[in-house]
């Protein structure tokens, strides 16, 4: 199959590689679409955290073409969303209700393919969506029935699920409270929708781009702030009779935005 490989801070290379056999608990998926995440840009610029060449892409959508021994959550022919690395379910954090801190998250997964020169390849987040096929743990997939295109559904595996999860599972937003979201990209807009589902009374989005502010309002924000014309902290206080936000989300990845959120 063809796959996009990354090694250190070098440019991506697209090469022919050979998949290793599908093992117990694994699923082989023909890739329909992959989600391009800013994480891939960061990994490329920083030299990456995975030693040696590997297949990038940690979320996607596709069709199941083969299932390994013991797999029950999918059948051949199913259309599935592939999410990023699953939690192990066994470490200290998983046992104490914090699967987002799973100790296995930073551990390299098993080899999934072999390069023409014999080099064995791992997959980013045990997914490797920048390839014609993905060989992934069954716990990573979610069968889905939808008429939406793969370009939309692939975002569910990372950007959308990360934003919704932050709002619904991590922040524990109380109904009627005020939420501030810094940044209205895919993560921020997903947080907005999660905050709305959680019953937040006021959802304030800080975003410099007018079109994103408009989209945030359509998706559930009650107020928007342009940081180019208004000071975000003071503006949020003005909207809340001086109280400020009960919960703040930083969805930009910028140090200045992080300081503002705190």
Per-region residue spans from a language model:
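NAD(P)H dinucleotide-binding glycine-rich loop of Rossmann-like/cofactor-binding domains
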Residues: 30, 88-182
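Adenosine-nucleotide cofactor-binding segment
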Residues: 178-184, 194-260
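Nucleotide donor/acceptor-binding cores
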Residues: 1, 78, 176-177, 201
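Glycine-rich beta-strand-centered segment in the early N-terminal region that forms part
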Residues: 20-34, 47-95, 100, 145-148
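N-terminal Rossmann-fold NAD(P) dinucleotide-binding loop
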Residues: 188-189
């Amino acid at each position: 199959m063809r796959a996009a490989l990354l090694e250190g801070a070098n440019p991506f290379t697209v090469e022919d590689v050979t998949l290793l056999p599908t093992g117990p608990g694994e699923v082989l998926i023909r890739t329909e679409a992959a989600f391009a995440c800013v994480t891939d840009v960061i990994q490329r610029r920083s030299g990456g955290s995975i030693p040696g060449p590997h297949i990038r892409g940690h979320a996607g959508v596709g069709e199941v073409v083969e299932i390994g021994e013991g797999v029950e959550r999918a059948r051949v022919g199913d259309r599935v969303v592939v999410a990023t690395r699953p939690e192990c379910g066994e470490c200290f954090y998983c046992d104490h209700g914090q699967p987002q801190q799973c100790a296995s998250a930073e551990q390299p997964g098993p080899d999934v393919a072999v390069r023409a020169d014999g080099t064995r390849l791992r997959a980013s987040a045990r997914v490797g969506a920048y390839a014609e096929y993905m060989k992934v743990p069954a716990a990573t997939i979610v069968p889905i029935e939808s008429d939406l295109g793969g370009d939309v559904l692939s975002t569910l595996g990372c950007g959308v699920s990360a934003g919704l999860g932050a709002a619904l599972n991590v922040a524990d937003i109380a109904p009627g409270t005020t939420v501030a979201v810094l940044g209205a990209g895919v993560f921020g807009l997903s947080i907005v929708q999660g905050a709305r589902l959680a019953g937040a009374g006021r959802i304030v989005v800080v975003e410099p781009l007018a079109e994103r502010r408009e989209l945030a309002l359509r998706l559930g924000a009650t107020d928007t702030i342009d940081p180019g014309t208004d000071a975000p902290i003071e503006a949020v206080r003005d909207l809340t009779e001086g109280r400020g936000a009960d919960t703040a989300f930083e969805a930009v990845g910028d140090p200045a935005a992080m300081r503002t959120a705190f």
